[in-house]
Each structure stands twice: as C-alpha cells, then as structure tokens.
C-alpha cells in the first residue's frame, strides 16, 4: 500500500485503498474482552478481534516465500499472518493468547516509573511513565507499538487469539524505543505516523487470511 500511495502522489491520481470484507460471525468482541484507552493522546485508535478454535502450524509456502523476500523469518501461521499484513498494509499488528489476558480486559495506559517488563525476546526492560503499555486487569502484556510480553505470547497450545491493530503516537514510540534500546519492525513503522483508518482494514485482512 505504501508503494501505491507514493505512485498515486507521483502521478497525481487518487489513491483507492483495497476494500477488505469483514469476516466472522455476529458475536461481538465486547462479549469476550473489554478495551479501555486511558491515554488517548498516545493511542488514537485500538481495534481488537477475537479468533477462536486456532490451530498453530506452518503458513502457506507462498506466504513464507514473500516474507523471506522481505527479510522476515517465517515462524508459524499466526505470526506470519500478522507480519504479512504489516508489510502489506504498513500496519503493525500483535496477537495475544486471550486465555492469558486476566479479567478479559485490555487497558491502554502509561507505565509506572521503575516498572520492569519481560519482552518476547526474554529481556527485562526497565520502564518509565512516558512509555505506553498494553495491560490486562492485573499486569502489562505488551509495550505498545514495540514488542509484546512473554506473559501473553502465542504458543502451540493457544486456542483463542486476541488480535490487535492500533494507531499509536509515532513520536512517543520513537522516544520509548530509543530509551529501551529496542527498535523493531513495528516501532519503525509507527515512528513514521500511521493512518488510524488502516487498522480496521488490516485486522479484517488478517482474519481473512486466518480463515483461509
């Protein structure tokens, strides 16, 4: 989509984003998880989707090849789909194991000074109150826009996913990433500033790929 936007600007043509149909049933996400944004100045949009009866396995060969061409190592179908959609829409996504989300709540709020958090790479990160976190009813589960936590990571035993697509403040992500010494594919995209409207299309695309 980034190339399409640049081409539209270069040739002075209107950019027409792809239309991705919403998949799933009539159940509401709110029946499974409550999302609360406490620091709206740092998170202009947060879209969540619940995916049940998940089976972890390898992603299709065509997807693995495309990810490899982008310099991304294929891992499994769920991680690969979130990475693929990130490259396709320039919209980072994250997947949580919903069964590990305490109280069925997602709270977007700043960290407390001196808090420590173990990220997916197994490193202990020292936080401060300028950093935005994704929390459940009891604990932080991700550093917003940068990296998820070990305490809610996807394993082969996952049954129900909580997918996240959000729009976090680019300046805050850049400063937090620098303080933590942790720059990721996701943070590098957020740093540039994202269109909040892309989140819904991206999460619909991810669900479409999961259903396939």
Give the residues covered by each predicted segment.
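RNA/tRNA-interacting regions in translation and RNA-turnover enzymes
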Residues: 1-212
